[in-house]
């Protein structure tokens, strides 16, 4: 089985194309649903990011430099930013820490939640692609390099059924190769 995909051959990821609701909208107007002015907590985080990197939340998403878009989507790395929070008593509290990023935030919330409703809401932003480790073959690298009469397992499994049947029917392996292959054929 592929190591990254647990043998499924596919990989789910949060697709930034699905996250950006309208490239003409600004972050303040809701370019990223749930991170606009209506969500005080997330919007205050974006305000801190914008202040630190020197851009305006009212700028349309498409007009933000890619560097700023990447900081919003993927975070500040190890760079600490100043965040101001309101605690339970209504006091302002200042904290310095890296910004997680919208996509890592969603990945964490999707992975850690026990709420089916939260998982369903976040799954709207997921896309599926072939696993980057096994390239969709569902096999570890070592298994992908095993040859059977000059064809590897992914090549054989991609054949139409009739062609694969003919391939196996006409397959002749002699000696030691035949002994080894007999166990799996």
Kindly give the residue locations of the regions a language model identified:
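Conserved phosphate-binding elements of NTP-dependent enzyme cores
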Residues: 1-185
């Amino acid at each position: 089985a592929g190591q990254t995909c647990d043998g499924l051959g596919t990989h789910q990821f949060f697709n930034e194309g699905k996250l950006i609701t309208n490239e003409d909208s600004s972050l303040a107007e809701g370019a990223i649903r749930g991170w606009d002015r209506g969500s005080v907590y997330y919007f205050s985080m974006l305000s801190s990011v914008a202040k630190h990197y020197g851009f305006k939340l009212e700028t349309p998403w498409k007009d933000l430099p890619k560097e700023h878009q990447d900081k919003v989507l993927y975070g500040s790395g190890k760079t600490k930013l100043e965040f101001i929070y309101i605690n339970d008593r209504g006091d302002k509290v200042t904290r310095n820490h890296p910004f997680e990023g919208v996509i890592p935030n969603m990945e964490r919330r999707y992975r850690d939640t026990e709420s089916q409703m939260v998982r369903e809401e976040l799954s709207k932003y997921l896309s599926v692609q072939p696993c980057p480790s096994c390239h969709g073959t569902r096999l570890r690298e070592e298994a992908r390099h095993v040859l059977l009469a000059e064809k590897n397992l992914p090549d054989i499994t991609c054949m139409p059924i009739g062609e694969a049947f003919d391939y196996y029917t006409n397959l002749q392996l002699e000696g030691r190769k035949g002994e080894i292959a007999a166990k799996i054929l």
